[in-house]
Curated annotation (Swiss-Prot):
InterPro entries: Ribosomal_uL15, Ribosomal_uL15/eL18, Ribosomal_uL15/eL18_sf, Ribosomal_uL15_bac-type, Ribosomal_uL15_CS. Binds to the 23S rRNA. This is Large ribosomal subunit protein uL15. GO terms for cellular component: cytosolic large ribosomal subunit. It comes from Prochlorococcus marinus (strain NATL1A). Belongs to the universal ribosomal protein uL15 family. GO terms for biological process: translation. Coiled coil: none annotated. Part of the 50S ribosomal subunit. Residues 25-37 have a biased composition (Gly residues). Residues 13-23 have a biased composition (Basic residues). Residues 1-57 are annotated as: Disordered. Transmembrane segments: none annotated.
């Protein structure tokens, strides 16, 4: 026997007819339609909304509204003000390793970010992960340059 598209049939018992509720006792789901005798779940307009607990104060309203959740994937920096860079010699290339070697920073765990507090009198080439706008302006006013690295 060859299989043809027009001769295909589904297996016996694999497709069940939809149960028609409320169409007489002989239909199997007449009268109360399988919802029981009385109560909220047997009435029309059911079901109740998600989270409804029968009039009891629901869980989502009992639990306090918490604030100050931690920032996900927060970037942390080792910060340094421009005024601290005056301790270095003119024309120095400044990076995280040099700052540790000179004793300006101790045990840095995060990338370097330069902040713009204070004044700068020394011309430097600063390599950092981030600069504030005021820090970048102060470094470039003196004749230095800012280099970003990731």
């Amino acid at each position: 026997m060859t299989i043809k598209l027009e001769s295909l049939q589904s297996n016996k018992g694999s497709r069940r007819k939809k149960m028609r509720k409320g169409r007489g006792i002989a239909a199997g789901q007449g009268a109360s339609c399988g919802f029981g005798m009385r109560g909220q779940k047997s009435r029309s307009g059911r079901p109740t909304r998600p989270g409804f607990e029968g009039g009891q104060m629901p869980l989502y309203r009992r639990v306090p509204k918490l604030k100050h959740f931690p920032i996900v994937n927060q970037k942390n920096f080792t910060v340094l003000n421009v005024s601290r860079l005056n301790a270095l010699k003119d024309g120095t290339i400044v990076n995280l390793d040099l700052l540790v070697k000179e004793g300006i920073l101790t045990k840095p765990k995060n990338p370097l970010k330069i902040l713009g507090n204070g004044n700068l009198e020394v011309k430097l080439t600063v390599q950092a992960a981030a600069f504030t706008a005021s820090a970048k302006k102060k470094i470039e006013e003196v004749g230095g340059s800012c280099e970003l690295y990731n």
